[in-house]
Amino acid sequence: MLRIAVAGGVCLCLLLPRLSRGGSSLVPPLQASSLIEHDTAVATQQPGPHGGGKTTAYSFFARAPDLQLVFRKRALHHGAAIGYHRQEEDEIYYIVSGTGELTLNGARSVVGPGTAILTRPGSSHGLRQVGPDDLVIIIVYQQSSGVRGR
């Protein structure tokens, strides 16, 4: 049986186990709750991490118990930046729209829609919005030490 509940703008979908005909075992076994979230429900205005300017952060699944993956969308508004910083875990940026200036280990390059960037532990990087449109990116990394920043 599928049960759907809406809490605080978040749709919680839970697949409940069914009893077998004999009533002695669960088929299928109980699984962790799955979530569906819309960006309008999780959007927050924030300064650019490690940098400055205005951004909108969309922290998807931040309240999901035991999720070790961070999946976020961030819109860097005019002149905003994710400041240059040293990376402590693998992190992926994917440029959805807009234009940015990426600094990766001291080298600068212009990035735009369709660009994927992998930063590895020990490397340093920063990203700044340039051009007329917001720079919209997807950020994915494995959560460490219970911190869900960026």
Residue ranges and their predicted role:
Residues P65, P121-V147:
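Ligand-binding loop in jelly-roll beta-barrel domains
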Residues A107-G122:
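Short acidic-glycine-tyrosine-enriched beta hairpin
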